[in-house]
């Protein structure tokens, strides 16, 4: 799988690979990536089923880890520093536990290796109820999501996944809702086994 990525900093600096959280993308890390690029060669990846990367089943930590290793091999990286937020933090933990030789250091943001309660059901349902083919604007989508997602900031975050269709007929979600919903328990669960705790 050919993952999309954004890079910052000079290629001769130490590599730092950044993983976004669930429903996020490399776009979320543009400002931080530019700052970290003063010290590292920063590569912010779009993980499978997110951003500009391909859609694929399953959406599991094992599959995401293998995607990352393929990407690293294609870019001649034997090892790297890793920074992961939320779902991306769980992915980084899995790499640290299962393939420590590929890790130089680990930064995990806002997540622990444990099961979390489901928190996206109402958001997924509301996103699916929007008639994207007839949607006139992003503002209309924002109004539609208001009842299910009352927090303005959360709605704007979700709407970063809404893209105008190339043929001009409405919008589409850039995330793979089917894969994310089908693998929700996997995403919410611990990425590592009890032998790594």
Go through the PLM ranges and name each one:
Residues 93-98, 103-137:
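Flexible "cap/lid" loop of the alpha/beta hydrolase fold
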Residues 23, 47-51, 113:
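Alpha/beta-hydrolase active-site loop signature
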Residues 12, 21-31, 42:
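Serine-hydrolase catalytic-loop signature spanning alpha/beta hydrolases and amidase-signature enzymes
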Residues 126-132, 140-153, 161-163:
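Helix-loop "lid/cap" segments that line or gate small-molecule binding pockets
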Residues 1-17, 37-40, 77-78, 182-185:
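Alpha/beta-hydrolase fold catalytic core
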Residues 167-197:
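Conserved serine/cysteine hydrolase catalytic core
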